[in-house]
Amino acid sequence: MKKFNDWLEKHNLRNIPTLIVVVAFVLFVFMTIAFLNHNDEDSSTIYITEDAELRTGPSAAYPEIHSIDKGQNFHKIGKTGKWIEVVSSNNKEKGWVAGWHTNLNIQADKNPNAKPLKDKTIVLDPGHGGSDQGASSNTHKKSKEKVYTLKTAKELKALLEKEGATVSMTRESDTYVTLDDRNIKGDAYISIHNDSLKSSKANGSTVYWFKDNQKALAETLSASLQKKALLTNKGARQENFQVLRQTNVPAVLLELGYISNPTDEDMITEKLHRHIVEQAIVEGLRAYFSE
């Protein structure tokens, strides 16, 4: 006790008002430091620490809504991987921003050249085949769906293998495979088709999913197709297809254009355009497995 009294005497703190001022100052310094260092991921308000982009979904594959400037703040409403779902203070705009552009101290991937598809098993299912030709066009080309789903799958397989993925195919030639036999396990399952209607006006691509664990893959691939491909994008939709229903892995069914539409048919049958679509699928898979 004597030592404490001596310490108070030495620092002239026996005066109660002086002691109160010192304590208040210490508390102020402590609270200021705590505020400046605050980066709790559970905080409802986030701050943009460098110029960034607000996107429609949780990856760079999703379309950009608009750019956002350093210093802006948003309310945090969700989080997927390293991406934060935000809404503006006036609730007028909503989207996703990369966490490494915020005060949440989320680190960007250290190696941007890493291959997220390395050692992943991707199942490619070229629709139809053999006696089941699928849809066909009414133009002079008389294009058959089974031919171009297989071409697309083979070309896509080569691109995915360059990314380090292992690719399994439900068919590799013009053979008929039952829907039950198409149920092959992998890290992702992609069934490839072309759409068709009696009307030649219908056009565009659609990505279908059925189970909850398939939705994120569908939305990511749809966003990548919208960003890269020339086909009209109809988005990601839920549908009870058997190939999606019978598997427990993330799976999608891609309708890559209407073979009944002459413009879409040209894009389906031209290798250069197929390559653009295939590259969009690869980029979508990269984005999906990066999260």
From Swiss-Prot:
Protein name, entry field: Probable cell wall amidase LytH
Any one Gene Ontology molecular-function term assigned to this protein's record: N-acetylmuramoyl-L-alanine amidase activity
Claim: Signal is one of the keywords in the record: yes
Pfam families associated with the record: Amidase_3 (PF01520), SH3_3 (PF08239)
Location of this chain's protein in the cell: Secreted
EC number(s) on file: 3.5.1.-
GO cellular component, one term: extracellular region
PROSITE patterns registered for this protein in UniProt: SH3B
Transmembrane keyword on record: no
Entry-linked InterPro entries: LytH, MurNAc-LAA_cat, N-acetylmuramoyl_amidase_3, SH3-like_bac-type
Primary residence: secreted
